[in-house]
Amino acid sequence: MTATLTLETMTSEEEYGPRNCVVCGDRATGYHFHALTCEGCKGFFRRTVSKTIGPICPFAGRCEVSKAQRRHCPACRLQKCLNVGMRKDMILSAEALALRRARQARRRAQKASLQLSQQQKELIQTLLGAHTRHVGPMFDQFVQFRPPAYLFSHHRPFQPLAPVLPLLTHFADINTFMVQQIIKFTKDLPLFRSLTMEDQISLLKGAAVEILHISLNTTFCLQTQNFFCGPLCYKMEDAVHVGFQYEFLELIIHFHKTLKRLQLQEPEYALMAAMALFSPDRPGVTQREEIDQLQEEVALILNNHIMEQQSRLQSRFLYAKLMGLLAELRSINSAYSYEIHRIQGLSAMMPLLGEICS
C-alpha cells in the first residue's frame, strides 16, 4: 500500500484554501500514513516510530508541537503524530521500500525507452516527407483521368444504366496512377533503396495494394461510407457497377470504417504503410533477416510514437489494433488480386497493377 496520497487527489486548494499539517500546523502536502501532514512530520514519523527505543520527554509530555517548536521535543511530536491518527502499519519496511523504488526506477527506464530517439524522429520525418510528396496529394489528381460526369456530384443518385466502360477506364487509370505514386514513395526511402532490386520488387508487389488502401482511408467518410477524392465522390455502387462482388466490398468497407474510427493523422498512416512495406514474408524475398530488422525498427517507432501522442491518440490498445488491421489487409490483398483477374478486361487495362497482383 502506498504511503503517500498527493494533494492532486485531495479537494482543490482553489476551492477550500491551503490545508495545514494536523501535527505542527505547517502547510500540508498530502495524506501520509493516514493523516494530513507536512513533509517534515511525514519524514519524522517514518524515522522515529520504527526505532526500538522511543524518545522520552523531560517535561512529562506537555510540550507544544508547532512549526516553530516541533524539533524541540521528539517524544511529544511522536505522541501527537499517533494521537492524530498516523499509523505505523502503513510504513513500508526497508525491503518493501527498496522494492517500490526499484519498480519506480524500472517505470522511469521504460518510459525513457519509449521516447523517440533523434534517429527515430528523423526516420519519421523521412517517411512523412515521402508520403506528403507522393501519396497525400494523389487523390486530388483523380479528376485528370476522364471521370464520368456523375462522379462530380456528392449527393447524386446512382445511375445503374450508365455505360460501364467510361467508369471501368477511369478506375483502371486511377489505380495505375496510385501504384505509380506508391512506387515513388518507396523509392524516396533510403532504407528501401538499400535493399537489392529483386527484394525491392518483391516487397512492392506484396505491399502496393495494402499501402493503397491505408492511404485511401484518408478520403473515407464514416457518415456516408463514400470516398471523397478532390471534387469526385466514389460510392460502393460504383465498384459494383465495375464488377466487384459485394462480399469483397464489404471487407473493404469494414476495414476502412475500423481504421477511420482510430482518427489517425499522416505520420501514423506513413508508419503503417512502412510496416506493410517491410514485410519479410513476402514471396521472392531473399534478405529476410535485414527486412525483418527494418520492420522491427518501424514497429518500435510506431509504438513509441503512439505513446508520445497519447493525449491525441485516445484509443486504448491502438498499436495492437493497427497490427490487427495490417493482418486484415493481407486478406483484402489476396481477395483484391482475385477480383482484378475475375473482372473481364480489367487486368489488361492496367498491366502494372495486373503484374503486382500476379
Curated annotation (Swiss-Prot):
Residues in NR C4-type zinc fingers: 21-41, 57-81
GO molecular function terms noted in the UniProt entry: DNA binding; DNA-binding transcription activator activity, RNA polymerase II-specific; nuclear receptor activity; RNA polymerase II cis-regulatory region sequence-specific DNA binding; RNA polymerase II transcription regulatory region sequence-specific DNA binding; sequence-specific double-stranded DNA binding; zinc ion binding
Signal peptide bounds: none
Any single biological process term in GO: intracellular receptor signaling pathway
Post-translational modifications reported in the UniProt record: Phosphorylated at Thr-48 by PKC, dephosphorylation of Thr-48 is required for nuclear translocation and activation.
Location within or outside the cell: Nucleus; Cytoplasm; Cytoplasm, Cytoskeleton
Domain notes: Composed by a short N-terminal domain followed by the DNA binding, hinge, and ligand binding/dimerization domains.
Annotated family: Belongs to the nuclear hormone receptor family. NR1 subfamily.
Name recorded for this polypeptide: Nuclear receptor subfamily 1 group I member 3
Annotated organism of origin: Rattus norvegicus
Gene behind the chain: Nr1i3
